[in-house]
């Protein structure tokens, strides 16, 4: 092979690797449920908050709907899927666990969107949306947790049938007495949500 080609390939790999390494939240690997409304993480998602050295770990098996954006708003350029999707997974997880306050979770969403290169207008629209309408999801998650429902599927239950929707599978797991696996201590990351500034 020509030396120039090899040098070009090495430079290209370095550039691509550098760009990928700078992504605050790597692209998630997900498996859809039958209706493609809910998705299960096939691999753990890790988000390093700014330069803090602190990481939020969303475990494999967590079920997300990405961004809970009402369908009428999709025609205005906002859908559940976009550059903000990875930040939305972290936000869904924070809303589910509720170890942080709701405001901290919303601020961490905004920080993650800033670091993910989401446009300022979309950051504002999504942040205003979760501040105005997120209480319903927060309360729904609180009630589901109190009722013993899960949103993190244990390793031995990850291979769900492709024809099943999440609400049906969740009920099956509940009826079988399946519990969520233990997750990491959130105390290190919640305080970064006391402001919306990237640390």
PLM feature spans:
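Bacterial N-terminal signal peptides
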Residues: 8-16
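Positively charged n-region of N-terminal signal peptides that target proteins for export
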Residues: 1-5
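Extended terminal accessory/targeting regions
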Residues: 20-199
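Short amphipathic alpha-helical "recognition" segments used for binding
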Residues: 7-8, 75
């Amino acid at each position: 092979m020509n030396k120039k080609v090899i040098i070009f390939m090495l430079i290209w790999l370095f550039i691509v690797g550098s760009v990928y390494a700078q992504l605050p939240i790597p692209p998630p690997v997900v498996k859809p449920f039958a209706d493609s409304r809910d998705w299960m993480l096939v691999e753990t998602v890790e988000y390093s908050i700014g330069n803090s050295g602190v990481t939020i770990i969303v475990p494999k098996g967590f079920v997300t709907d990405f961004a809970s954006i009402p369908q009428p708003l999709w025609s205005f350029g906002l859908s559940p899927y976009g550059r903000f999707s990875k930040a939305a997974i972290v936000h869904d997880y924070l809303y589910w666990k509720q170890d942080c306050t709701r405001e901290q979770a919303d601020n961490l969403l905004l920080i993650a969107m800033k670091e993910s290169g989401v446009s300022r207008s979309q950051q504002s629209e999504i942040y205003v949306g979760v501040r105005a309408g997120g209480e319903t999801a927060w309360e729904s998650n609180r009630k589901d947790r109190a009722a013993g429902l899960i949103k993190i599927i244990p390793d031995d239950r990850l291979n769900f049938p492709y024809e099943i929707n999440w609400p049906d599978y969740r009920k099956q797991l509940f009826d079988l007495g399946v519990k969520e696996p233990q997750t990491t201590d959130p105390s290190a990351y919640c305080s970064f949500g006391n402001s919306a500034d990237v640390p």
